[in-house]
Amino acid sequence: MKIIFVFALLAIAACSASAQFDVLGQSYRQYQLQSPVLLQQQVLSPYNEFVRQQYGIAASPFLQSAAFQLRNNQVWQQLALVAQQSHYQDINIVQAIAQQLQLQQFGDLYFDRNLAQAQALLAFNVPSRYGIYPRYYGAPSTITTLGGVL
C-alpha cells in the first residue's frame, strides 16, 4: 500500500514538473519570435516614459506623426549599422599594423617594390570591396613606402 502511495506521489510530481517545463518552453519560444526592434523598444520603453513625464511631451502631435515614426525607424537602422562599421574599422587597423610590422621586420633585409605595391593595392581595394572606407574621403594621390613613392 505504501509503495502504491509513493508511486502516486511520484506521478503527481512528474506531471507538475512537466507542466512547468511546457510553460517555460512556450515563453522561451515567444521570446525567440520577437523581433530585435521590438526587444529594443521594450528595453528603451522605461526611458521613453521618463522623458515624456519629465518634459511633458506625451501629447505632442509631432511624436505621433508618420514623419516622426519614419525618422525614428531610420535612426534605429543607422544605430544597427554603427556596430558593423566599427568592426570594419578594426579590420583596417589590423591591416595597417600588419603592414608596419612587415616593414619593420623585413625593411632592413631587402625591399621588394612589387610586394609593396601589391600590399598598397590590397589595402585600398579590400575596404572598398566591402563597402567600407577609411577615415580619409578620397584616395591619396601618392603612397609613400620605404623605397620611394608609388
Swiss-Prot record:
Region forming the signal peptide: 1-19
GO molecular function: nutrient reservoir activity
Modified residues (Pyrrolidone carboxylic acid): Q20
Major localisation: other
Keywords, sorted A to Z: Pyrrolidone carboxylic acid, Seed storage protein, Signal, Storage protein, Vacuole
A Pfam family matched in the record: Gliadin
Keyword Signal: yes
Listed InterPro entries: Bifun_inhib/LTP/seed_sf, Bifunc_inhib/LTP/seed_store, Glia_glutenin
Record bears the keyword Signal: yes
GO terms under cellular component: aleurone grain; vacuole
Subcellular location as annotated: Vacuole, Aleurone grain
Miscellaneous comment in the UniProt entry for this protein: Lacks significant tandem repetitive sequences.
Family assignment from sequence similarity: Belongs to the prolamin family.
Function text: Seed storage protein; serves as a source of nitrogen, carbon and sulfur for the young developing seedling.
PANTHER family: PROLAMIN PPROL 14P (PTHR33454:SF19)
Protein name: Prolamin PPROL 14E
Biological source species: Oryza sativa subsp. japonica (Rice)
Annotated gene: PROLM7
